[in-house]
Curated annotation (Swiss-Prot):
The gene is zip-8. InterPro entries: bZIP, bZIP_sf, C/EBP. Residues 65-128 form the bZIP domain. GO terms for biological process: DNA-templated transcription; regulation of transcription by RNA polymerase II. It comes from the Eukaryota. It holds the Pfam family bZIP_2. PANTHER family: BZIP TRANSCRIPTION FACTOR 8, CCAAT/ENHANCER BINDING PROTEIN. CDD domains: bZIP_BmCbz-like (cd14813). Residues 58-80, 91-101 have a biased composition (Basic and acidic residues). This is bZIP transcription factor 8. Belongs to the bZIP family. Residues 47-57 have a biased composition (Low complexity). Residues 81-90 have a biased composition (Basic residues). Residues 100-107 are annotated as: Leucine-zipper.
């Protein structure tokens, strides 16, 4: 199991200073406080020989391994693709935002005009209502006058007929 964790197959891990703040750090370093090593490329089970003894070709630099380089190339391509898609999405959102702002301004102007038209229509309706009420009152008065003449035997005066009616005997006598 320790063979799978040897540094020859994995890239060197970056140093993270926050791990020293973990509560288990004090326990781990209590037994050997003077021999703290941050080199995780070698297993503690191997002999502490020099690097020349391992340079017989069995140890490959993790930064130069083909798998690592291929992984980095794929990651770089994915990052470029992600950046391009994000830029495209942001540009699309920006143009859509500008379009919506223009539409909103046009709708606000249309709303303003509609409110003005509504106010004018309300004034016209009020004036027409007042005029209608005046006509209704006048009509009621005329009906009352008409009913007054219809109920009585009195015939309303008609000056034109009276002037031209030749059946009246005193027609010419009044002129003398």
């Amino acid at each position: 199991m320790s063979n799978t964790m040897q540094g020859a197959h994995y890239p060197q891990m970056a140093f993270d200073p926050t791990w020293q703040m973990h509560p288990a750090y004090a326990t781990a370093t209590a037994f050997n406080p003077y021999n703290v090593s941050f080199d995780f490329t070698r297993s503690p089970n191997t002999s502490g020989g020099s690097d020349e003894s391992m340079s017989d070709g069995s140890k490959i630099d993790p930064k130069r391994s083909p798998k690592y380089l291929e992984k980095r190339m794929k990651n770089n391509e994915a990052a470029k693709k992600s950046r391009a898609s994000r830029k495209h999405r942001e540009q699309k959102n920006q143009t859509e935002n500008e379009l919506l702002k223009r539409k909103n301004a046009a709708l606000e102007e249309e709303l303003k005009q509609a409110k003005c038209e509504l106010a004018q229509m309300q004034i016209t309706i009020r004036d027409m209502s007042i005029e209608r009420e005046a006509y209704r009152r006048e009509n009621e008065m005329l009906k009352m006058v008409n009913n007054k003449f219809a109920d009585s035997k009195f015939e309303p005066p008609q000056p034109l007929r009276d002037m031209t009616n030749c059946n009246l005997p005193y027609k010419y006598e009044l002129l003398s």
